[in-house]
Amino acid sequence: GEYFVNYVKEHNDGKARVVELTNAVSTHCQERFVGLHEVIDAANADGCQIEILNKYDSQGNRETAYNAISAVVEPYDYVISDVDNGAMGAVSALQATGNTSVKVLSMGAYGQEPFGMLHNNDVNYLACLNVDAWVLAQFIFDGTISYFEGKDVPTQTNIDLFVVDNSNVEKFWSF
């Protein structure tokens, strides 16, 4: 959220219109927007004018995200998706219409596709939060072992997240 607000302050004089792509059935994806909205609300209280125009449930699905973004008629500056599949669908929809001005951010991404787009300075894909699948898998594996050994399994797991953009993507992926 802070990366986004700082970017809007620097590039849009603190003003932005945002379309959100959510995954309504995923609790942890919904939580990502709670944190984002807290940061946006604080920025707006401090003089920014960041408006959430609408929220579309992309279901973490590229095609649904593509269709949602293709149907937006009011002007907007940014698309924020909770997962990389939604972001990739948004990028595809924007590029199919030749739109190079709207920027897309993802609150969860990892791998060659999103990192390659950042490395190649894609005109629409701006940044993502690095959600390392290996780290998540390790927590799941450890939790499963603990469960079958009769040990307590944490109900919540926190991992380190890092904002990745074209300035630091090479720290997270080899090209």
Model-assigned labels for residue ranges:
Residues G1-A16, A65-Y66, A87, Y110-F115, ...:
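Hydrophobic alpha-helical segments within soluble ligand-binding/sensing domains
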Residues Y3, H28-Q49, T64, G89, ...:
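Short, solvent-exposed amphipathic alpha-helices that sit
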Residues K15-V18, K103:
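Residues that mark the start of a beta-strand
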Residues R17-E20, H37-R62, D160:
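Short beta-strand elements in bilobed, periplasmic/extracellular small-molecule ligand-binding domains
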Residues L21-E31, S81-N85, A133:
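Extracytoplasmic "Venus flytrap"
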Residues L36, N54-G116:
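Hydrophobic alpha-helical
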Residues H119-N130:
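Rossmann-fold dehydrogenase core element
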Residues V131-F175:
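Hinge/cleft segment of the Venus flytrap/periplasmic-binding protein
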